[in-house]
């Protein structure tokens, strides 16, 4: 124990944190953690589902509430599973001089054990073993000389730290770099400014200091109030905190407030739709974002969101303030969780004789395999870095899914030996007819099968989950290599591979933007669904498209695209998008367009007698109203003003959404019976679960 205390004194002197891993039986790990923590004063916060009663603890699911706070020493319990997001978040809260003690299973069997955390990112109902990530993680721990590994049955050996200069902690005054940025910000009359940095670099501190220098009013917003603890330590006491949605609601109600600066901390964790809506209300905005990690990735945020802003100035902070440079804890977790982006990721390629599309001979497309990543870790690093740069919601959860979740398919595109593009697909479909029927009816929603289930539950394509498909989860091309056909080449390659596997279709879900849809359309995809709500992540309406491969896939694509075109006249009342879809002029006078066909009867029966959502049935309801003379006040108000549910409920004297939905279903039932009672009964029986329908036919 003397070495433990000596190292802690060194850590305090050098301003660094250190990781100590206890590996063995569960009870042994806990006992040693208690003994070690008793040797040194500190917070010794436990992140565990099964912490001893005598310690301060919280589960991994609540670690996000700690962001913006600081602790001295902690214990992270990974005996039943590794929540890497919580691990990264916890490490970011530890002060210089701290130990992070990590409890893990016996070293030799760890990679073979079911990991409880897999329930968050795998589509399996039971925990699965995660050998690829655990072996990768173990390698990083063993490769770092400053990590202490104490295995049960072996002595505790703590190597002394290499000699380095004593650490001089920040004294509350801005550093030279912070001073430079503050000077530029104070001189700015308007604009959007972004500070990017890894954790512990003082970006929140700088934001707080800006309020002290501003003569006008400053407001603060962030994903949560607790995330602004450090910012508010340095901010003026009169700088209020606003939740992002509450701030937007206030601005929409009262207009632009008389505010000098809006400070947005950890901006990558706030929906881009909210950010886009907030920007016009404020003359000067300072946003901070972590370069990598668990709140979303700052580099991707810059590429996706900030690149579209006409006036945006980006600053970076590189030197740590809360601990010394080359901190052992930060270093090993950066390596293990692939937080460090390859320096040459966005370097431009050599010119290709002025061609806009790379010759196929220069493009090497290959299938990536998790087994190969253990022997060629640089390939994993490049693939994951590309995904992070192109999708700023990418997190360590995706790294775990990428390495160990079943049904993942990854293809990479190499140019001159460098990986410049990645395509990630996920297996979907293959559900039984009865389960697909229940998904369509809204009775069941099993894990996984994102697009396949949504096509059934929302687009009315009840048999979509029974077909075999692969969904495009992510596609990423290095920023300097775009517009050269790499993305299309990846899709074409995996289309051929899917055809070899006798799959029915490929699918993709994306935030609808005309240029993005143009890309998917150029790859052969057909639009089959537009969601009725804005996505929180993209601020766009969700779109789904499929690329048919088999006869059944072509039938599905044709049915879906024709249904969307037929419904779009009415769906536009809910979804203000300008889609180039084939439509009949004067559609309400076109008998074929407004006739109730079997698809409409199925849809309406699903709404009336099961749990189909109103949004999925809206167009069929509008057609139904043309054919019935019943008053149906709730449905007619819905057709006229579909986005004003609260007002409709109040007009009808109903309390709440549930009561209104119940009334809509009742009125639909009445209309079906009035139109054709026998046909309505046939479809009611079709909608029922198999066993219930059988009982109804044979009472």
Curated annotation (Swiss-Prot):
Binding-site positions, acetyl-CoA: 475-477, 482-488
Subcellular location: Cytoplasm
GO molecular function: 18S rRNA cytidine N-acetyltransferase activity; ATP binding; tRNA binding; tRNA N4-acetyltransferase activity
Transferase is among the record's keywords: yes
Gene Ontology CC annotations of this record: cytoplasm
Enzyme Commission code: 2.3.1.193
Reactions performed catalytically: cytidine(34) in elongator tRNA(Met) + acetyl-CoA + ATP + H2O = N(4)-acetylcytidine(34) in elongator tRNA(Met) + ADP + phosphate + CoA + H(+)
Protein family per UniProt: Belongs to the RNA cytidine acetyltransferase family. TmcA subfamily.
Name of the protein in its database record: tRNA(Met) cytidine acetyltransferase TmcA
Origin species: Pectobacterium atrosepticum (strain SCRI 1043 / ATCC BAA-672) (Erwinia carotovora subsp. atroseptica)
């Amino acid at each position: 124990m003397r070495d433990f205390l000596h190292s802690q004194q060194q850590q305090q002197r050098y301003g660094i944190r250190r990781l100590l891993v206890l590996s063995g039986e569960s009870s042994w790990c806990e006992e040693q953690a208690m003994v070690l923590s008793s040797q040194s004063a500190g917070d010794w916060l436990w992140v565990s589902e099964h912490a001893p009663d005598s310690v301060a603890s919280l589960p991994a699911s609540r670690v996000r509430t700690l962001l913006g706070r600081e602790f001295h020493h902690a214990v992270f319990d990974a005996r039943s599973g590794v929540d890497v997001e919580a691990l990264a978040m916890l490490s970011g809260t530890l002060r210089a001089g701290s130990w992070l003690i990590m409890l893990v299973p016996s070293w030799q069997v760890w990679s073979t054990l079911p990991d409880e955390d897999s329930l968050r990112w795998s589509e399996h109902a039971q925990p699965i073993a995660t050998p690829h990530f655990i072996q990768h993680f173990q390698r990083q721990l063993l490769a770092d000389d400053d990590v202490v590994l104490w295995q049960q049955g072996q002595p505790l050996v703590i190597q002394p730290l290499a000699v380095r200069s004593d650490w001089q902690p920040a004294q509350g005054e801005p550093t030279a770099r912070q001073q430079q940025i503050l000077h530029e910000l104070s001189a700015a009359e308007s604009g959007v400014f972004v500070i990017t940095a890894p954790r512990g670099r003082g970006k929140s501190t700088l934001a707080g200091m800006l309020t002290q220098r501003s003569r006008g009013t400053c407001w603060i917003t962030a994903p949560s109030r607790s995330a602004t603890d450090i910012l508010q330590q340095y901010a003026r006491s009169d700088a209020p905190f606003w939740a992002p949605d509450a701030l937007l609601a206030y601005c929409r109600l009262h207009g632009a407030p008389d505010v000098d600066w809006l400070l947005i901390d950890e901006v990558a964790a706030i929906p881009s739709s909210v950010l886009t809506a907030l920007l016009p209300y404020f003359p000067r905005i300072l946003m901070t974002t972590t370069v990598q990690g668990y709140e979303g990735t700052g580099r991707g945020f810059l590429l996706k969101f900030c690149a579209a802003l006409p006036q945006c100035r980006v600053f970076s902070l590189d030197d740590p303030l809360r601990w010394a440079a080359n901190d052992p804890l930060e270093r090993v977790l950066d390596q293990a969780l692939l937080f460090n982006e390859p320096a040459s990721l966005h370097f431009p390629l050599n010119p290709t004789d002025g061609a806009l599309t790379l010759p196929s001979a220069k493009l090497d497309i290959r299938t990536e395999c998790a087994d190969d990543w253990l022997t060629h870790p640089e390939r994993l690093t490049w693939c994951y870095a590309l995904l992070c740069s192109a999708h700023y919601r990418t997190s360590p959860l995706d790294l775990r899914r990428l390495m160990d979740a079943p049904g993942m398919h990854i293809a990479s595109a190499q140019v001159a030996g460098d990986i410049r593009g990645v395509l990630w697909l996920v297996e979907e479909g293959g559900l039984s007819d009865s389960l697909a029927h229940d998904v369509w009816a809204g009775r069941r929603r099993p894990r996984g099968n994102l697009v396949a289930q949504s096509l059934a539950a929302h687009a009315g394509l009840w048999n979509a989950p029974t077909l075999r498909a692969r969904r495009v989860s992510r596609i990423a091309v290095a920023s300097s290599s775009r517009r050269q056909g790499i993305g299309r080449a990846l899709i074409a390659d995996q289309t051929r591979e899917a055809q070899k596997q006798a799959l029915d279709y490929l699918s993709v879900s994306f935030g609808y933007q005309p240029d993005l849809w143009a890309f998917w359309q150029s790859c052969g995809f057909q639009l089959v669904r537009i969601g009725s709500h804005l996505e929180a992540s993209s601020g766009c309406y969700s779109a789904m498209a499929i690329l048919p491969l088999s006869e059944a896939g072509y039938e599905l694509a044709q049915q879906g695209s024709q249904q969307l075109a037929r419904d779009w006249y009415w769906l536009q009342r809910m979804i203000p998008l300008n889609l180039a879809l084939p439509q009949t002029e004067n559609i309400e006078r076109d008998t074929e367009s407004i006739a109730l066909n079997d698809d409409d009867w199925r849809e309406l029966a699903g709404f009336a007698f099961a749990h189909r959502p109103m949004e999925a049935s809206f167009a069929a309801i509008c057609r139904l109203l043309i054919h019935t003379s019943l008053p149906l006040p709730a449905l007619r108000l819905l057709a006229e003003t579909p986005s004003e549910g609260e007002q409709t409920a109040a007009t009808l004297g109903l309390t709440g959404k549930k009561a209104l939905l119940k009334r809509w279903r009742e009125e639909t039932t009445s209309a079906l019976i009035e139109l054709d009672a026998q046909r309505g009964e046939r479809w009611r029986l079709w909608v029922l679960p198999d066993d219930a329908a059988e009982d109804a036919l044979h009472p």
